[in-house]
Amino acid sequence: AIKVFHIVAETGIHARPAT
């Protein structure tokens, strides 16, 4: 899940910080 969050953040949808 952490990896997914990182990908999402890199896409530009910085909705949640990397926990």
Swiss-Prot record:
Subcellular localization, as worded in the UniProt entry: Cytoplasm
Name of the protein in question: Phosphocarrier protein HPr
Function field: General (non sugar-specific) component of the phosphoenolpyruvate-dependent sugar phosphotransferase system (sugar PTS). This major carbohydrate active-transport system catalyzes the phosphorylation of incoming sugar substrates concomitantly with their translocation across the cell membrane. The phosphoryl group from phosphoenolpyruvate (PEP) is transferred to the phosphoryl carrier protein HPr by enzyme I. Phospho-HPr then transfers it to the PTS EIIA domain.
Entry annotation: catalytic residues: 14
Residues of the HPr domain: 1-19
Domain of life the protein comes from: Bacteria
Any single GO BP term: phosphoenolpyruvate-dependent sugar phosphotransferase system
Keywords from the UniProt entry: Cytoplasm, Phosphotransferase system, Sugar transport, Transcription, Transcription regulation, Transport
Gene Ontology cellular component terms for the protein in this record: cytoplasm
Statement: the UniProt record of this protein carries the keyword Acetylation: no
Family to which this protein belongs: Belongs to the HPr family.
Primary location group: cytoplasm
InterPro entries reported in the protein's UniProt record: HPr-like, PTS_HPr_His_P_site
